[in-house]
Amino acid sequence: MRGVADFDGIAAAYRWMEYASVGPMLERVRWWWLDRGELDGARHALVLGDGDGRFTRRLLQKNRQVRVTAIDLSRRMLGLLKRRCRVDKERLRTVQRDVRGEMPERGIDLVVTHFLLDCLADDEVEPLVRRVRASLQPGAVWVVSEFAIPAGTLRHPARLLVRSLYFAFSVLTGLQVSQLPDHTGALRRCGFSAIGKKAFWGGLLVTELWKLEPEAKSPGE
């Protein structure tokens, strides 16, 4: 992310921009673990950068016990999220701040980042993971959904698509990142283990489940 990207200008149109570029695929990716009951046991979720709130609303609807803290830098995106979740507003807390700052909660058992980590520079991911980790219960689960560059014949088309998306967001929001970070290495170094993965579109889109090992330590601890 480097400098602060401004998503306010595209908040109202973001859903339709998403549909125009990749259709409903990102929603399928977001819903994957939730619709299969993998998140039913969560009681306090930290949702970072959910944008207009479609995932947060679905989580609150499907899990009637969970409380959600949603953090986003964009005031307009948070406004859309709150309107979408107004029926369950008693179980929702919203915080407008840069996700690269300190986390405001403790006792989190579920973290969700859908298409957020790819907005960060490679050297920003591990510090974020360390800060989030300090807020988590042992055994907490982290859902990560991202674009990826698959091996094989789709590698070059995938690179072209990802490059074009980064260019579009640099123009529309001022995003300064231009390549996918290594989030898997950062999570492993901070004590998380991969427990599930689903790939879409030949590996161009992936959603993963990571679990914080009970005795894990972050680098430097």
Where are the language model's segments positioned?
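Residues lining the SAM
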Residues: 114-117, 145
